[in-house]
Every structure is written in structure tokens, then in C-alpha cells.
Amino acid sequence: MSQSQNAIFTSPTGEENLMNSNHRDSESITDVCSNEDLPEVELVSLLEEQLPQYRLKVDTLFLYENQDWTQSPHQRQHASDALSPVLAEETFRYMILGTDRVEQMTKTYNDIDMVTHLLAERDRDLELAARIGQALLKRNHVLSEQNESLEEQLGQAFDQVNQLQHELCKKDELLRIVSIASEESETDSSCSTPLRFNESFSLSQGLLQLEMLQEKLKELEEENMALRSKACHIKTETVTYEEKEQQLVSDCVKELRETNAQMSRMTEELSGKSDELIRYQEELSSLLSQIVDLQHKLKEHVIEKEELKLHLQASKDAQRQLTMELHELQDRNMECLGMLHESQEEIKELRSRSGPTAHLYFSQSYGAFTGESLAAEIEGTMRKKLSLDEESSLFKQKAQQKRVFDTVRIANDTRGRSISFPALLPIPGSNRSSVIMTAKPFESGLQQTEDKSLLNQGSSSEEVAGSSQKMGQPGPSGDSDLATALHRLSLRRQNYLSEKQFFAEEWQRKIQVLADQKEGVSGCVTPTESLASLCTTQSEITDLSSASCLRGFMPEKLQIVKPLEGSQTLYHWQQLAQPNLGTILDPRPGVITKGFTQLPGDAIYHISDLEEDEEEGITFQVQQPLEVEEKLSTSKPVTGIFLPPITSAGGPVTVATANPGKCLSCTNSTFTFTTCRILHPSDITQVTPSSGFPSLSCGSSGSSSSNTAVNSPALSYRLSIGESITNRRDSTTTFSSTMSLAKLLQERGISAKVYHSPISENPLQPLPKSLAIPSTPPNSPSHSPCPSPLPFEPRVHLSENFLASRPAETFLQEMYGLRPSRNPPDVGQLKMNLVDRLKRLGIARVVKNPGAQENGRCQEAEIGPQKPDSAVYLNSGSSLLGGLRRNQSLPVIMGSFAAPVCTSSPKMGVLKED
């Protein structure tokens, strides 16, 4: 820094002394700041121990050590050699700007007054020196410019002097030539004789040459001026041309630059346009694809709309047709009520004629059983009672009557509680637990050891059902369906009319069979055998509260809700309702009495005390004559009135008798259950066989592993649709106990149409020896658990099991392509006789004689009513097994959309009665 100042301040104008004095002042200031031995600085340092040694931030950044102002004299001599005006100017500008930084630094360290004062003085000196140096720099710059201009003028003067010297040399040479020529001429003239004449002539001649030379000189000068002017003109033109060329070049460069910029801009615009075009193309392609999809969806929606229109129209037609069918069924209901009243009047007249001593009081609304069949049954029972020990039988009768009256008292209390709050019917397909009752078939020609082994197998499986249900225990949920069950029993009245002809034929056939028997029967028998001997191929099924279905036929004190099995129930009726036995030994038409002949083998029965709420049940084992067994094993396949032939995967199955729905001695057990819903009347009526067809296995989540899955015809289809509406129907189930029979059936969705199954078209094959006893569920006491359920053949028209009526089935036929399987009803056939009307309702059929039956079996297999086999299901909320018949011939009435769900089934125990 001092070098630049010395270089600038040393000038020939005499300003060096001033700058040296200023430099000394700045040195003094710097020395004060850099001297560490000053007392003021020591005082401040002692007062403030934490204050560090003073050092400017600017000095720290730019390595300022306070030595730039104190330079030695030997360095000042060579300062002007390495300094330039630009460096000096930038240095002074830095010093001027340094004052602002010092002020900022002063604000930071304002707690030291002495240092602040010294720094302010230093700043003022530095600013003054910087301003003086800046002024001197400006003056030096002006002087340097003047020096350059003078040097340029000096060069021009040197050029002019050289030019003048050149011209002077030329003129001297020309004068020398002229002088030489003149001297030669003078020498020539002096040699002539006339001297004076020659001298005058030479003088004149020289003057003439001088004039000529002067003229030539002038011409040369003029020519020189012209050439100079021309050269100047050419020079000016050249300059102008150069300027024009330079301007043209600059213009071209400018235009080229503008063109390049425009080209780059247009390139960018083109790239943007191309990107936009690509984006538009993508959007266009996406829009085109969306248009195609929307057109496709539009077509689908149009097709769906047309289908929905068709379905809506079909549903409207179905609704109208359902309304018409409803009115038609109401008319048929009124007609059935009229028939019922007529039949009741006839029954009343027959009772008044038959026996004045009979005191069984039936209700006018329900005349299901006649006095003839009941009296005949009691007659057979009493004949068997003659061979028993009188004292033991009376003791047992008293104990049984005591249990019955206790049961009546409990049932009356339960009924009073359940009338005001009727329970809702559990719907199959829901998750509620339900009790499934299946038939327990067995053949009569088995050996005694085989019977015992089967009983042991049944006893081993009894413990599973003991924890799930107490048999015979009354409850409000079971008694809530009493009115519905009583209305179902009214169908027995209609079925009874179709059984009269069959009883006469069966009487003759039974007598013929018993006449061929050779062996006698040893041992004691009980009244229970009166029913078991007539139904040798039947199976006993125990309902939780099957006796409660008889309430409508007895006085209040005789209404039994506990299950009373077989002839034991008739025994109680005999003791309580008919004390007068004057006409008990009279023969009754249509009733078979077993007391007049011996049976081929001992009949053993086991009964458990159901009235004491035990967990076990009743089991009967009856042997059949060998001749009848051989006939049955070689009989041809037939099709019953209500039972269709079924061909299982395990092998062919044979129906044992020509009319299994009407047999007494060799018939299949048929039990009736009804699933009631608030739907339109259904056209589905099914008969459940027990031994002629493969039985179903009932699975339970709470039972042992011996239970298998249910495999029922039309189950999968009914489960898929019936379960989907379970919740809705649970909330809409109602109960009515005061309406008429037809109205209640219509409310519950019950009708008596015959279900036609295409499977009956296949002929039946004989049953092999290994299948003497049909497969029964694992919980049946009469047979061991099945290794696997026998599969059923698929049904073609599965929708008939859940359709409410034919128009709804037609609606589903349009949707799923189902073929119709029923013909529309003929309204013109309403006014017929009683048998034709019953046949039209699908409840009973006219039974042919045995000879005609044997000839018409093939025709019945083709054109007869086709019924699918099924198991008997009883909901847990029901208090009775609706429709349990003595003759096991009433068809099963299935509710529409009834999707049964198997859970647990109580097992029937085996207890020997001492």
C-alpha cells in the first residue's frame, strides 16, 4: 500500500513533501494502534479480562498486519517500477469503502472508548489520504493523456520535417543540374571569336532555359498537387468504402444473429408444437378408446335394459297370474272347507250309528281318525293283554297314567304361556340349531344276533345326542307351533278317504300271509306290538313333542305333548277315553287284529321313560315270516303312489311293496313335516320314504365324527336361494291360530301339489343281499354309521323345489332356460265328485287292486307322479313332528324355498322293560 502511495506522490511538481507529511501522520496513527505498550490499552485490558486483543475483522479477512504503512526507505525508491494507475485507483477505492466497515466494527466493539476514538481518527486520516490520492490519480491521468497527445503531434512534426527535407533535396539536385548546364554553356561561349556577341547570346540562352525550367517546375508542382489531391480523394474513398464495408459486415452479423435467434426460437416453438401434437394424439387415442368402451357399455346396457324390460314384464305377468292363482286357491279353499264340513257330518252320523258307548270326543273341526280304525287297534291291543300278568300290567298302567297326567299339567301351563307370545318359526337355511328326525328302517327277516348287534351299535351312539337335547321336554318354543300342526292334521281327514279301499285289500293280503306261517311265537308281548306287527318294514321315529298334535281331538285333560310311541298311545286312549269295552271284540272292517294267530318269532320291544325327560328313545325290532321275506327279496321294482324310484350310485334300490304309501305290514315309514313361510301357496308335495330309498346322513357341528354331510335332491339349489332370503323371512314370519285351515295354509305357503320327478322314468333294479337294511344316518340306533352317504342323481328341474308358483317358474325359465314340468290347472274340472277333487289336489290317488298293480307298474313308472326322496327334518323351534301317522301314508308337505339344514339329531335309546 505504501509503495503505491510513494509512486503516486513522487511527481516533478513538488508535491512529494505534502504526501510524505501525510504518510508520516498515518504512520503515527498506525503506530499508536499497533503499539501494545500504551497504558490506555493496558488499562482496558486489565478492566476487561475476557476482552481479547484488538484486531479488526477487515484486517483478519485481508491479512492486515499494520505494516503496510511503515515501509523502509530502500523500498520507496523502486515503488514506481511495479505500480500501475489501475492498481492505485482500486487501492484507494478499497480504502474509502473500508470506513463503512470500520463503523460496523465500531458498533460491535463500542464498549472500549479509547479504541473507538483512535479508530475514528484513523478512519478520518485514511479517508483524507484516500481522497488526496484519488485526486492525484486523476491529475496524473490527465497529464499522461496530454503527454500522449504531444508525442503524437511530435511524430506528425517529424513526418512533416522529413517530407520537407525530401522536397528540399529534390530541389537542390535540380538546381545543381541547372547550374552545371549553365556553366558548360558559359565555357563554350567564351571560346568564340566574337566574344561580346557570344556573351550576349549565352545570357539570353540561359534566361530562356531558366524560364523553361521554371515552367516545367510549375507544371510538376501542379501535377504533384493534382496527384496529391487525387491521392487524398482515393484515400477518402477508400475510407468511405472501408466504413461501408464495416457497416455492411456489422449489419450482416446483426442480421445473422437475429436470424439465428429467430431460428432457435422457431425450433423451440416447433418442438413445443410437436410435443403438443403428440399429446393431442395420445388424448385422441384415449378418447377413441373411451368412445369404443362407452359404445360397448351402451350396447350392453341396451341389451340389459331390454332383458330387464322382459323380466319386468314377466314378473308383472307372474304377479298377475299369482293373484289369479290366489283367488283360485281361495275358491278351492272354500270348496275344501265345504268338503270338510260334509265329511264331518258324515263322520258324526257314522259315530252315532257305530257305537253309543264310545266316548272319544273329537272336535268338529278336526275329524282325522274314525272310530272304526281306533276301535280295531284297541281290540288287537286288548287281545294281547289277555296273555299278560294282570297285576304287573295294572301297576304299569297306573304309573304310566300318572306320568301322562303330570305331562298334561306341564303342557297346559306351557300352552298358556306360549299362546300370548307365539314363537317365530325357525327357517331352514339360517344358522339356528335344528333337530333332524330321519326314518329308522329295518327289515323283518333278520336274525336275532344281527338285531342285537344293531341295537348295541345304536346304544353306543346314544351318548352323543344326550348333551344336545332332552327328549320330551316341553317348552314355549315347541308349543308355539301347535295351531299350525293342528291345521296340518286336517289333511289326514282327506287322506283317510283314500285309504278305505286299500285297507280292504290289505286285510285279505295279510290274512293270506298269516295263513302260511308255520312257526309259533313264544314269550310275552305287549300292546306295542299291535302297531309293530303291522309295520314290519317300518322304523320308529321319536319326536320331541309329537303327542301335542292330538290336542285338537281330545278334551283339555287328555291333551298330551310328550311323545307316546305306537300302541302305547292307543293303550292310553283306551284307558282314558273308552272305559266301556263291550264291543271291543267285534270285527272292524279295515283293521287287522293280530291276536288270532301266532307270529313266527318273538317280538322284542324296548321302551324308555320319555315322560321323565330321559335322553333315550324307543326301539322296536320285529321279525317277518320267511315266506314274506323271500317274496320281498324277489319282488319286482314298482312305483308307489307317492314314492318315485331312486337309483343311487352305490347300487340299485328296490321298493319292497307295490304301494309303500298305503301298506301296513310291509310299508315304508312316511312322516310329515311342514316348513311354513309367508309366501304364495306352493305346488310342492313330497313323500319321505325310510327303507326303500337311500337315507340321508345328517351332519352336526356339535356331534362326533360319525356324522356325515347331507346330500339331498335339490338341496344345493334351495340352499343357495333359500339362505339368501333367510334374514328377511325371519323378520316377517307370523302365526295365526284362529283362521281357517285353507287360509292358514295359504299364509304359511303350503299346498298339496304332487312333485313330478324325472327320475321315476328309470326302472329299478333288485337290491343286493348286502343292502338288506338300507343305509340310515349315523345317529340311528337300528344301523351302524354309513361309510359314506349315497349320492343322488342330479335333478333337471331344481327350481321347482323353491318356486312359489308356475308363473315365477316361467320367469326363471326365461332367465336360466329351465323347462316347464307342470301343466296349467284346468279350472273347468272343479265340479267333480269327492275322490276326483282329492286326486286333483294331489293328496290321494285311487289304488288299483293287486292284480292291476302288478300289470300297471311299468305305466306308473312312466306316467305316475314323480317324487324325490328326502329326509324328514324337524325344526328345533317346533314342538311336534307334524303329520306323524299311524299308517305312515301321508305325503310330506314341503314349504316353498324350504332349504333344510341338518344339525344334531337325538338318538333313540334301547332299554329293556322288566
Curated annotation (Swiss-Prot):
One GO BP: dendritic transport of mitochondrion
A GO cellular component annotation in the UniProt record: dendrite cytoplasm
Compositional bias per record (Pro residues), positions renumbered to this chain: 775-787
Residues found modified as Phosphoserine: 420
Highest taxon, organism lineage: Eukaryota
Domain named HAP1 N-terminal: residues: 48-353
Distribution of this protein across tissues and organs: Widely expressed, with highest expression in heart.
Membrane-spanning parts: none
PTM entry text: O-glycosylated.
Primary location recorded for the protein, binned into one broad class: cytoplasm
Cellular compartments annotated: Cytoplasm; Early endosome; Mitochondrion
Coiled-coil portions: 134-354
Region (Interaction with HGS) location: 359-509
InterPro entries in the record: HAP1_N, Intracell_Traff-Reg, TRAK1/2_C
Keyword entries, A-Z: Coiled coil, Cytoplasm, Endosome, Glycoprotein, Mitochondrion, Phosphoprotein, Transport
Region (Disordered): 1-30, 447-482, 765-787
Pfam families on file: HAP1_N, Milton
GO molecular function, one term: myosin binding
Biased composition (Polar residues): 1-21, 454-471
Assembly with partners or alone: Interacts with GABA-A receptor and O-GlcNAc transferase. Interacts with HGS. Interacts with RHOT1/Miro-1 and RHOT2/Miro-2.
Function: May regulate endosome-to-lysosome trafficking of membrane cargo, including EGFR.
Similarity annotation: Belongs to the milton family.
Name of this chain's protein: Trafficking kinesin-binding protein 2
Organism listed in the record: Homo sapiens (Human)
Gene for this chain: TRAK2
